[in-house]
């Protein structure tokens, strides 16, 4: 098996290096990742400037682009040979609920899915036990073979920031959701000009049993199938009925 690994925290982040080291025990691995932190880049592609991949001594690559750029580049003729699986992570911090909208970690996996490959996104609910998340991924890859064959979904994994031995197990979950975003942070820079920072993530609003928030909070690894199709199917009929009524008045 040959695995393409990417992330949004950047090539030099601890999470991706720990992940690649562990994956290399079970497969051939090549990293193509951003050359800097590109957190919350979502699925953006770089269209107004060229991508410049830099070949590193160990055979991996870092790129002056987004996570989606890296996977798009790697799988569209840049890499030679077959790739069997895309794994994105390990993200420093969870990607649960509404986080998935902004996440560059998920975007890299979704780009792999878009290009026809099975894909996994993995995040750690903290910044300490990356080795736990890496072991989880290596443990799950053989077990997820059937599910990974679905070309229209990715698997989103969130891991509690605990030693591996303290994990309670695995739960398949739906996404929870957070409350409205907190206000931006207003400051003055050294030139006395007003600047703004995007604030931290809002607190979970739906962390009921069955959600990813609930699982991770209670010591379980959450496993959530994610699809790129954003259609609200439950609203199609009611919207069509409304439209029909409006045009028959």
UniProtKB/Swiss-Prot annotation:
Identification of the protein by name: 5'-nucleotidase SurE
Coiled coil segments of this chain: none
GO cellular component: cytoplasm
Classification via Pfam families: SurE
Function: Nucleotidase that shows phosphatase activity on nucleoside 5'-monophosphates.
InterPro entries: SurE, SurE-like_Pase/nucleotidase, SurE-like_sf
Family annotation (SUPFAM superfamilies): SurE-like (SSF64167)
Organism annotation: Haemophilus influenzae (strain ATCC 51907 / DSM 11121 / KW20 / Rd)
Reaction(s) this enzyme catalyzes, per UniProt: a ribonucleoside 5'-phosphate + H2O = a ribonucleoside + phosphate
Record-annotated membrane-spanning stretches: none
């Amino acid at each position: 098996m040959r695995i393409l690994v990417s992330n949004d925290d950047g090539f030099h982040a601890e999470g991706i290096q720990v992940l690649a080291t562990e994956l290399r025990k079970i497969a051939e691995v090549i990293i193509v990742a951003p050359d800097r932190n590109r957190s919350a880049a979502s699925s953006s592609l770089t269209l107004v400037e060229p991508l410049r991949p830099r070949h590193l001594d160990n055979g991996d690559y870092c790129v002056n682009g987004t996570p989606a750029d890296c996977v798009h580049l790697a799988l569209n003729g840049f890499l030679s040979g077959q790739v069997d699986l895309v794994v994105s992570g390990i993200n420093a911090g969870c990607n649960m609920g509404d986080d998935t909208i902004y996440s560059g970690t998920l975007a890299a996996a979704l780009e792999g899915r878009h290009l026809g490959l099975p894909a996994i996104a993995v995040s750690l609910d903290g910044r300490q036990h990356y080795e736990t998340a890496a072991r989880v991924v290596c443990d799950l890859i053989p077990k997820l073979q059937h599910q990974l064959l679905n070309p229209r979904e990715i698997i989103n994994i969130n891991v509690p920031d605990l030693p591996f031995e303290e994990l309670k197990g695995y739960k398949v979950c739906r996404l929870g959701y957070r409350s409205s975003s907190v206000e931006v942070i207003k400051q003055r820079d050294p030139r006395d000009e007003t600047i703004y920072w995007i604030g931290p993530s809002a607190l979970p609003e739906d962390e009921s049993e069955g959600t990813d928030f609930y699982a991770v909070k209670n010591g379980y690894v959450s496993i959530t199938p994610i699809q790129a199709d954003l259609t609200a199917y439950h609203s199609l009929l009611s919207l069509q009925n409304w439209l029909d009524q409006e045009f028959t008045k």
